[in-house]
Design a protein with these regions (language model features):
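Nuclease-adjacent, charged terminal/linker segments that flank catalytic cores
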Residues: 1-48
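Electrostatic, structured charged patches in enzyme active sites and in nucleic-acid/phosphate-binding
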Residues: 48-217
Length: 217
């Protein structure tokens, strides 16, 4: 498939790492093949030349979406790069937007994959401020949403979840308790029902609490 330009292969690694890993991306002939089968394809050649941090966010997002699609009977739909705020000055697109529904219970989840890239805390704070503005100005019907979505931060590991939450606390970012946390390896679990977490304040301490979410069964 590499020779026929259906896929291209890239390596992620650095001088101080003993291992690298491979990433396979769509190529132009694969796009033509899929379109010939009347499948909608948004791929562009520039998608394969994005910065490493961007590609890692895409991979983390895709891993989470695929895990939910394959393991959760409540999965209804997903939109990649869903527009939450269309205003040019405050434009906000979620990495992914997932709808889960079972019976009369339905939630929308905006997915934010966070990577420890250069200046990642500053970049995260900028995103958090966009989400806060979105929550503060939200009206039913905004971009097709009747209620504010939950935000799911996909972190690199357990420690990273605490680092992300610290940025929120230190900058007084209040997202109305509609925030969940998870990390990459948890998407490999056979069941996802205990893979989302929240930070709770108890006895003057902040604790990380795994949640038992029926919609993730």
């Amino acid at each position: 498939m590499l020779k026929t330009k259906l896929l291209s292969r890239y390596y992620f690694g650095s001088l101080d790492e003993k291992a690298a890993y491979k990433v396979y991306c769509l190529e132009k002939n694969a796009k033509h093949l899929l379109e010939a089968r009347e499948l909608k394809v948004k791929w562009k050649p520039t998608d394969n030349t994005k910065p490493v941090a961007v590609m890692k966010r895409v991979l983390a997002t895709n891993q989470l979406v695929l895990a939910i699609k394959s393991k959760c009977s409540s999965y209804k739909s997903d939109i990649i790069k869903k527009v939450l705020v269309a205003d040019k000055e405050n434009e906000l697109k979620a990495n992914a937007f997932i709808t889960l529904a079972q019976g009369i219970t339905k939630i929308d989840v905006a997915v934010e994959a966070i990577r420890r890239e250069k200046n990642w805390e500053e970049k995260l704070l900028a995103r958090l401020n966009l989400y806060k503005n979105f929550f503060d100005t939200f009206k039913p019907g905004t971009e097709g949403m009747n209620e504010k979505p939950y935000i799911l931060f996909v972190c690199e590991d357990k420690k990273h979840m605490a680092e992300v939450y610290k940025v929120m606390v230190m900058n007084n970012i209040d997202l109305e308790g509609r925030v969940y946390f998870t990390y990459d390896l948890l998407q490999m679990e056979p069941s996802l029902e205990n893979t989302w977490h929240q930070f709770i304040h108890e006895d003057q301490k902040i604790k990380l609490q795994p949640l038992n979410i029926e919609l993730l069964k």
